[in-house]
UniProtKB/Swiss-Prot annotation:
Keywords: Ribonucleoprotein, Ribosomal protein, RNA-binding, rRNA-binding, tRNA-binding. PANTHER family: 30S RIBOSOMAL PROTEIN S13/40S RIBOSOMAL PROTEIN S18, SMALL RIBOSOMAL SUBUNIT PROTEIN US13M. One of its GO terms (molecular function) is rRNA binding. One of its GO terms (cellular component) is small ribosomal subunit. The keyword RNA-binding applies. Residues 95-122 are annotated as: Disordered. InterPro entries: Rbsml_uS13_C (IPR027437), Ribosomal_uS13 (IPR001892), Ribosomal_uS13-like_H2TH (IPR010979), Ribosomal_uS13_bac-type (IPR019980), Ribosomal_uS13_CS (IPR018269). One of its GO terms (biological process) is translation. The gene is rpsM. This is Small ribosomal subunit protein uS13. Belongs to the universal ribosomal protein uS13 family. Part of the 30S ribosomal subunit. Forms a loose heterodimer with protein S19. Forms two bridges to the 50S subunit in the 70S ribosome. It comes from Desulfovibrio desulfuricans (strain ATCC 27774 / DSM 6949 / MB).
Length: 122
């Protein structure tokens, strides 16, 4: 089992699909990485040699921000927005949609479960 960027890539999967298990790598980025390293995307993870795995690992470390570093950067960007008090930061702080979506209806995922109305006391 190949381990790249702290992630165990699943055995038996094609290389382009297996790379998407790394946070921050999608299909397009995976194909770019495989093109620059010269690894065939149709091959399985099991078929890769140690040199090819090291080549992919080196490409990721040099040119891409993935996993912990990327998560840290995203959370620090959100924290910065909240600290400066801009509109997007306030929306993050209140747990509401950030990109201008309507909230009168919808936005249940972002707002959380509904609070029920208080019933009439007997």
């Amino acid at each position: 089992m190949a381990r790249i960027a702290g992630v165990d890539l699943p055995r038996g999967k094609r290389v382009d699909i297996a790379l998407t298990y790394i946070y921050g790598i999608g299909r397009t980025t995976a194909m770019k990485i495989l093109d620059t390293t010269g690894v065939n995307w149709e091959r399985s993870i099991d078929d890769l040699s140690a040199d090819e795995v090291n080549e992919i690992r080196k490409e990721l470390e040099q040119h891409y921000k993935v996993e912990g570093d990327l998560r840290r950067e995203v959370s620090s960007n959100i924290k910065r927005l909240m600290d400066i008090g801009c509109y997007r930061g306030l929306r993050h702080r209140r747990g509401l949609p950030v990109h201008g979506q309507r909230t009168h209806t919808n936005a249940r995922t972002r707002k959380g479960p509904r609070r029920g109305a208080v019933g009439k006391k007997k």
